[in-house]
């Protein structure tokens, strides 16, 4: 089994971290580069930046953040948010991103995933899926993809969509349960498992982490290859080291060399 990756996620708006980072004594908790450097030193396996800047005009700010982060950090960097064209992907990769995450654009036009993967390689292309459970109690589990921060239903089945984008060339799936996101109640492991069983690429579990055992559940029960969390790390509830030690205690392989 490959080593399980622990991935903090930073939401960035107009070049600033939106959910404050309080876990270390940062001079400027709103500076994403400062936060990224702290996570790098703490032993994070990767970092995800999600650019939630509303307007496309302000894209220059995230490029500056990516450039400065890539200069100072060794961990791989995934950047998502507002990626709509092959040029967007190219620009982010040139700025220093290792992987680019595509969300709404993949829902609107599946072929974009294939075009990006063909141009830059499958290993660079992550498809982010935001899913909500739509099945009723007692029914077979069904999850639907929602866009625009979980507000807009698409009618698209999440499991089928995951299969389609992987067939087109997505090298990884970043899977967020909109039902669990921000609740601290743990991943929707049934959703994670359903997607992990349906595709042959790594699945990153996201949405709902409140305890270290939730991370273990995401791998053990959910079949994920990596776990992503925001609040538990940003607010100092747990450190990256503690997360990895808990995974190791559970018998899961992690990188503990920091």
From Swiss-Prot:
It comes from the Bacteria. GO terms for biological process: L-histidine biosynthetic process. The active site is at residues 11, 130. Pathway: Amino-acid biosynthesis; L-histidine biosynthesis; L-histidine from 5-phospho-alpha-D-ribose 1-diphosphate: step 5/9. It holds the Pfam family His_biosynth. Its EC number is 4.3.2.10. It catalyses: 5-[(5-phospho-1-deoxy-D-ribulos-1-ylimino)methylamino]-1-(5-phospho-beta-D-ribosyl)imidazole-4-carboxamide + L-glutamine = D-erythro-1-(imidazol-4-yl)glycerol 3-phosphate + 5-amino-1-(5-phospho-beta-D-ribosyl)imidazole-4-carboxamide + L-glutamate + H(+). InterPro entries: Aldolase_TIM, His_biosynth, HisF, IGPS_HisA/HisF, RibuloseP-bd_barrel. IGPS catalyzes the conversion of PRFAR and glutamine to IGP, AICAR and glutamate. The HisF subunit catalyzes the cyclization activity that produces IGP and AICAR from PRFAR using the ammonia provided by the HisH subunit. Belongs to the HisA/HisF family. Heterodimer of HisH and HisF. This is Imidazole glycerol phosphate synthase subunit HisF. It comes from Xanthobacter autotrophicus (strain ATCC BAA-1158 / Py2). The gene is hisF.
């Amino acid at each position: 089994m490959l080593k399980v990756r622990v991935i903090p996620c930073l939401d960035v708006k107009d070049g600033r971290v939106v959910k404050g980072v309080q876990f270390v004594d940062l001079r400027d908790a709103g500076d994403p580069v400062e936060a990224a450097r702290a996570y790098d030193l703490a032993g994070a396996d990767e970092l995800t930046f999600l650019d939630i800047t509303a307007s496309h005009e302000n894209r220059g700010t995230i490029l500056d953040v990516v450039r400065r982060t890539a200069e100072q950090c060794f961990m791989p960097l995934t950047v998502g948010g507002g990626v709509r064209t092959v040029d967007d992907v190219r620009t982010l990769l040139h700025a220093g991103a290792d992987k680019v995450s595509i969300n709404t654009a993949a829902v609107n036009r599946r072929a974009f995933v294939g075009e990006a993967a063909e141009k830059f390689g499958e290993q660079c292309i992550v498809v982010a899926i935001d899913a909500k459970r739509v099945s009723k109690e007692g029914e077979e589990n069904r999850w639907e993809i929602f866009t625009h921060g979980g507000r807009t239903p698409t009618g698209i089945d999440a499991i089928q969509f995951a299969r389609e984008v992987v067939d087109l060339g997505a090298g990884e799936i970043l899977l967020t349960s909109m039902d669990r996101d921000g609740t601290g109640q743990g991943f929707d492991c049934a959703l994670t498992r359903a997607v992990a069983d349906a595709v042959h690429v790594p699945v990153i579990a996201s949405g709902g982490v409140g305890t270290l055992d939730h991370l273990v559940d995401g791998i053990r029960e959910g079949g994920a290859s990596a776990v992503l969390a925001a609040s538990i790390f940003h607010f100092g509830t747990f450190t990256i080291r503690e997360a990895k030690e808990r995974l190791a205690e559970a018998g899961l392989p992690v990188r503990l060399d920091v």
